[in-house]
Amino acid sequence: MKLNELRDNEGARYQSKRLGRGIGSGKGKTSGKGVKGQTSRTGVAINGFEGGQMPIYRRLPKRGFHNPNAKHFAVINLGRLQKAIDEKRIDAKATITAEILSAAGLIGKVLDGVRLLGHGEIKAKVSIEVTGASAAAIAAVEKAGGSVTVAAPKAVAEG
């Protein structure tokens, strides 16, 4: 068998039947939609309509709320930070900031700042500047000989 002899199995691919192309096609006139009524027309499905039965979105109670004052931090764990240092994506000698973490691809968009968490291990002596840090993360960095500076987030200029 050669590459130019490869073929699909018989019946593996077939052309879909064209609709509304005459009586002889088997799908002419009404195109298999029957006669009149809601389902014969466009935009048939009414979202959430369950045939008159009380829909699930009305049977279940409302829960919770959206807190407009919630803070959204970009999170970085010690293990990922150490891995980036080992891979030479971050220079451990320089002060590590949100900009450096973002450039290294460790965090996404910084909304209300960066929060350092203590999952994983840090061996490098680092100086890191973040807007929030867990007690475990601070203890681990200081044990490795580094320092954590918790600073207020920089105000984003509105305009």
From Swiss-Prot:
Originating organism: Paramagnetospirillum magneticum (strain ATCC 700264 / AMB-1)
UniProt GO cellular component terms: cytosolic large ribosomal subunit
One Pfam family recorded for the sequence: Ribosomal_L27A
Protein name: Large ribosomal subunit protein uL15
Gene it is expressed from: rplO
Alphabetically ordered keywords of this record: Ribonucleoprotein, Ribosomal protein, RNA-binding, rRNA-binding
GO biological process: translation
Biased composition (Gly residues): 21-35
UniProt keyword Ribosomal protein present: yes
Disulfide bonds: none
